Amino acid sequence: MAEVVPAAKRERHHAGEFLHGYRVRKWLGDGAFSVVYLVEDPKTHVQYALKHVISEGEKEDRYLDQLRMEWEAGRKLKHPNIRDIVDLRGDQTFGFIKKPGKDLGLVMEMIDAPSLEDLLLKNEPRFSIAQWISIFRDVASAFVHIHEKGFAHADMKPNNILWDRDHTKVIDFGQAWKIGTKKPRMSGTAGYVAPEQPLIDVITAQTDVFNFGATMYRLLRGKFAPQAVQKGYPRDFQLAEDVIGESTPLTQWNPEIPERLSDLVLNCLELEPSRRKYMTFVLKQLESMQPVSVK
């Protein structure tokens, strides 16, 4: 079986070349097994981001499957706080027969904005609590829409939230999965993973609620939530408070944080999924904390 070659080690496409019908403008970045380019439609001159994935062996086919799931979820999602997914190139259809491709390109809305992870690492800008609530409200609104369409994101973290002064956008549905079905592989990112995720259990909306709670905790506190699964936990570990820590209320760290917000974050971080509120409740709580939009 062929060795898996990370995307960063593969030859990149250069400006002016064509890729899946789009003209490459420049390289934007590498994922674990994808390369993202700024591309332009030669007919309309509209610019997009194109995520390019190639499989050179059976081991890498799962990355193609992830891209197809990202397309399946993304094309059904139309929300102002979710990045638009425009097209998937590379698979071929002949009548009722579909021939899977080994070279796929996911065409996405181009967003020129940093992630909250970027801003967190740079320690800029310093958001007010009102601004954080506004951002959290936008993200929760996006998640309500995602869940209504029957999907879970399964990898919420600051790096998957883009922000500028006018927009908040949830991105990267590469780990998305249909709610109520079992995911064959663990998803998520250490420091944000819900306790049930390493068990490769059925994906539910409450998994996203936990991931979002861990994200809010990190952004408000600057540290990872103790309840979130960290790197190195075995997949067969049991849910127990002596294994996974507890978070102290955020109000003890910053008295400017409203008690209702602190309580909401801690509820999202409940170890048992059944004890977490639904995202509709989370959104209503955030909306009630801030009736006026603050950017």
Question: Model-flagged regions — what are they?
Answer:
Residues 58-76:
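AlphaC helix of the eukaryotic protein kinase fold
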Residues 135-136:
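Activation segment signature within eukaryotic-like protein kinase domains
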Residues 78-94:
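Conserved HxN/HPN-centered segment at the entrance to the catalytic loop
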Residues 25-31, 36:
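Protein kinase glycine-rich loop
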Residues 147-163:
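Catalytic-loop of the protein kinase fold
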Residues 97-115:
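Conserved short submotifs of the Hanks-type protein kinase catalytic core
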Residues 208:
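Conserved catalytic-loop aspartate of Hanks-type protein kinases
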